[in-house]
Every structure is written in structure tokens, then in C-alpha cells.
Swiss-Prot record:
Cysteine pairings via disulfide bonds: none
Membrane protein topology class: Multi-pass membrane protein
Catalytic activity: D-mannose(out) + N(pros)-phospho-L-histidyl-[protein] = D-mannose 6-phosphate(in) + L-histidyl-[protein]
GO biological process terms held by the UniProt record: phosphoenolpyruvate-dependent sugar phosphotransferase system
Gene: manP
PROSITE patterns membership: PTS_EIIA_TYPE_2 (PS51094), PTS_EIIA_TYPE_2_HIS (PS00372), PTS_EIIB_TYPE_2 (PS51099), PTS_EIIC_TYPE_2 (PS51104)
GO cellular component, as recorded: plasma membrane
Xref: InterPro entries: Bacterial_PTS_Sugar_Transport, PTrfase/Anion_transptr, PTS_EIIA_type-2_dom, PTS_EIIB-like_sf, PTS_EIIB_2, PTS_EIIB_2/3, PTS_EIIC, PTS_EIIC_2
GO molecular function ontology, one term from the record: carbohydrate:proton symporter activity
Domain statement: The EIIB domain is phosphorylated by phospho-EIIA on a cysteinyl or histidyl residue, depending on the transported sugar. Then, it transfers the phosphoryl group to the sugar substrate concomitantly with the sugar uptake processed by the EIIC domain. The EIIB domain is also able to transfer its phosphoryl group to a specific histidine residue in ManR, which leads to its inactivation. The EIIC domain forms the PTS system translocation channel and contains the specific substrate-binding site.
Name of the featured protein: PTS system mannose-specific EIIBCA component
Amino acid sequence: MKLLAITSCPNGIAHTYMAAENLQKAADRLGVSIKVETQGGIGVENKLTEEEIREADAIIIAADRSVNKDRFIGKKLLSVGVQDGIRKPEELIQKALNGDIPVYRSATKSESGNHQEKKQNPIYRHLMNGVSFMVPFIVVGGLLIAVALTLGGEKTPKGLVIPDDSFWKTIEQIGSASFSFMIPILAGYIAYSIADKPGLVPGMIGGYIAATGSFYDSASGAGFLGGIIAGFLAGYAALWIKKLKVPKAIQPIMPIIIIPVFASLIVGLAFVFLIGAPVAQIFASLTVWLAGMKGSSSILLALILGAMISFDMGGPVNKVAFLFGSAMIGEGNYEIMGPIAVAICIPPIGLGIATFLGKRKFEASQREMGKAAFTMGLFGITEGAIPFAAQDPLRVIPSIMAGSMTGSVIAMIGNVGDRVAHGGPIVAVLGAVDHVLMFFIAVIAGSLVTALFVNVLKKDITASPVLSETAPTSAPSEAAAANEIKQPIQSQKAEMSEFKKLTDIISPELIEPNLSGETSDDIIDELIQKLSRRGALLSESGFKQAILNREQQGTTAIGMNIAIPHGKSEAVREPSVAFGIKRSGVDWNSLDGSEAKLIFMIAVPKESGGNQHLKILQMLSRKLMDDNYRERLLSVQTTEEAYKLLEEIE
């Protein structure tokens, strides 16, 4: 039986790839052929072809954002949230094997299909689709404004102010421009999720009107609440017009003229004459109330936000709190996102610390999992805690909620602010956090509370326990990729080269099973020489400078005895990877304290597409998350054995 699947989450960093990995592993265990297309932060990967869709027996979509299903009309289709793809992959595949899923007709014709959509909660899915496109605008705007204020701001009684004639004023204005797109993008892509392309224009127009109070005589706009209302109103108006029966002569112009024009008029006039002013008043009152919160009321809000963020670790409850904090950034209230930014990273960091402090409480594989979780927490990826919660929810979930609530309260009391819609120490390092010292105190305190709670609640492991197979540890790619995508992704078109697997860009000549270097610099030189002898480099010194520049930004040792030094340089002739093993290990300033033993060096030409190195990082880390695979790779003795194992990375 042949199955196909698509996975996608609002942010496209963690859940997308965890669900894909779990579906693939579950299919392997059940002896079923499956291909998984991922629609993540760097675009569509492993795209399903028309021939594959034609030959498939069933399709599984595990997504929390809108996925175009038109290509699956007439096929058996199971549509669920991405969390089900992570936690219940075998159950989903078993349903497909049993034929217990409906045939997809269209978004409007299939009753059973609509029933399936209701189970997935379409309102949440449409909302998260808008959020996923909105967040990059908040991140770009917040980072640019934070950098401009940090480097160009002058202290005044009103705080940091950038002089009008300063270069940094231009940077601040670019950041503000990014913020101005936030609500139109949110509304536009909510409508797009509901009505496809005909909903995009009316959604964006409605979002712009919602954000511009002058349309309805309001001093302030209707904010993100107005954007959400505009998105749903535009989407369902477009969908309603789309369903109207019209003469065949008019059908060709329906999606490009009739639907966008009339849906835009409906949402625009509704906001100007009916909705805009009342919603603006509600939003203004909410903003004033939040800004005026003091004492016990602000602590209560912090407790609620901390609990929501950690309760389902990237799920629907988490996303509602995250959306609230993100929206407040656009209104200039950074002290809501501050406690959220702290709460986001506490679950994975706290559990990583727990595995270090309570070694008798965790299996060796779980301790390795803890290292990966800790690393992911540094980059604000809450999902690193999911494997622990899946194995022991009754002890882990209360512990991480207690830690996140503690950290959020400390952050709220300390007036911690965050100008970027993201969390974890990475945002503090990038200068996006106000009151950095209190931020780190809150993170450390909350993480220690989580670690202590978990270790108090958990019993010592038995001599040789058998662990049930659950969701695997999240890929180190999320930590590596999060570090790489902290700058805005310029394009999701992802100019990828032809390589489909690692051995397309690595040859036996680029493998050294017994590295001789004693320091990280020695290892870098050794691998660069291999690349040079293979003809991959135009200049050894030029490429080494690119590698060292990258290391200065932060270590490329991602933990679990892995280092992935990489550089994009004019000194590189073609994309290549060199690999070496240092059996005794070498200090690489790893985030989890482990020495690097498996070293992959990535070389990419400067003029290549912006996502090539991210694709290679994902290829590597998806496989390297497998404890057994890393052990097998460390045990190879010859170049041939290593190359054969590397053939599995694709």
C-alpha cells in the first residue's frame, strides 16, 4: 500500500519536521511505503508529484495551517492537526490502511470531508494560517527597531530616542514599515485559508482598514482583534460569493474580478460603517487595561500566560497566548511578550537540566534527549520538551507548567519586555529584550523549578527498564536551523540545487574516519584541506575565514557530540560536505558541554540560493537525531563503511 502525507505547522520550525519524522518511522514499523511532503519555514520540501498522487492509496495531512487540497480530489484523505502527526502516527496510518477515511471531493461538496474538517477545528486552522504569515513581519520589525535603538538611541527622560538625522533612524523606520504590514497580512492569510486566492485581496484590504482608524473616525485602529474579524469576514464573504451560481460567460472572471471586488466592498463597508469603531474602542480599552496592570492583576496575567505556553508546548493553547503577546508588540506593549518569551524556553531548558541533575531518573537515551532539548530551549523552541511529556505526561506537564509560571511572574515583576515575536535566550543575545538581567534570572529560576519538580516526582529507573516507543527527540536541526534563521528568510522559493541526498555532495575523498587534529582549529584545517584537494574550493584561506567568522557568531557544536562548522563564501566552487570522526573528542564549546566527535563541514558558494546550507543542515540533523545511527557512525573504521552509512542521509 502506498501512502502520501503532508505536514505543516504555523511557524514551520519544529512540529512540521517532528510530525514528518514520526510518520516515516511509524510507516517503517508497519511495513508501509510513505512519502512525506513538509511545508516548513524554508518552503516546500520533498514535494509530492502528480504521478505519486495518482498512484497513492490514501493521503494524510497533519497540519495546523491551510494546505491546498485541490490536487487530492477523488483520493482518500485524512486531515488532522499536526499534533496528531507527532503523537499518534501509527493510529493515522492504521486508519488509512483500514480504509476508514472519506474520499475528498472538494471543500464544499463532501459531507464526510467537512465532518473531518470540523474535528480539526477549521477556525483555529484559519487563524493559525494568518499568524504563520504575520510572525515574520513582527520578527523583522522588532529586530530592526531593537538594533536601531541599541546602537543609535540616545538616553532622554522619555527613554532611548534616535535622532532624526541619524542613520539608525532609517533602520528604525524600516522596522516600523515591517510592523505596518502585520494586521493586513494576518487578515489576508486568514481569508486566504478560508477562500483560497480570491480571499487574499479582500482580507488584506479589510486588515488595512481595521488597522487605520481614520476610516471610521477613531483615534486608534481596531488592532489585531479587528484584523482577525476582517480576515474571517472577508474569507467567508468570498467563499459565499464563490458558491453562487453564475452564467458560464462570467465564471472565468469570478476569481479575479467579481469575488475580490464584491468581498472587498462587503468587508470594507462593514468596517467603515458598522464594525470598526466599536472594535477599536474595545481594543483601545484592552490596551489601556493591560498597560495599567499593577501588582496582583499583572501577576495573575503572568501566571495564566506561563501556564498556557507550557501546557501543550506549541499546540493550540500555546499559540493563543503567543498570538496575544505578538499582537501587543504591534501596539508598543512589550511587557506582555516578555513573560511569554521566558515561558517559551523554560520547558526544554528545565528538562535538559533535570536529566543532568537526576541521572538516576533517566535512561541514557533520555539524557541524550535532554541535551537536545536544552539546546532547543536556548533558541526558544518549546517543542524540545514534547518527547518527555509524551513518555510521562502526569509528571512532566505539571512540572513544566510550574516552571513557566514561575519564570513568567519574575519577568512580569521585573518589567521584562520583548520586541520580537519569539522567545529564549537567543532574543536577549540579539538585543530584543528590555531588562536582560531580569530576563535571565527568570529563565534560570523557572528552569530550576521545572528540573527540581520533575526529579522529585520521578522515581529512579530500574536496572534495565524497557521504554515504550514514543515520539522521538526533536531534531537538532531545529536548534541549528533556528540559529540560522534568526535573520529574516528572504524568500520561500528556496533556490535549491539538484542534490537529493548527502552523498550527492560528499564523496569518499571527503571522509576521514580518524581525524588527527587535537583542537577545533586543527580539525577545521584538516577538513578544509580535504575540500581543497577535491577541488571544491577556490581558496583555502578565503573559506577558512568564512568558517571562523561563523564560529565567532556562536558555536556550531549543537550537542550530542556533533559539530557542523559551515560557511558561505566566494572561495567555494560548489556545494560540498566534508566529514570526519575524532574518536577521543575535541572541545568545540558545545552548548551541552559534550566534546565534538562527529564533525561535518558544509561549504556553500556565496552566490547560491539562501537556503542551501539550511537544506543540508536539515538533511544531516534529521538523521543525526537517531541515537542508534550516531553510535553506528562512531563505530565505523573505514572510509567505505562511513560512506555507506552516509548514503542513508537524504
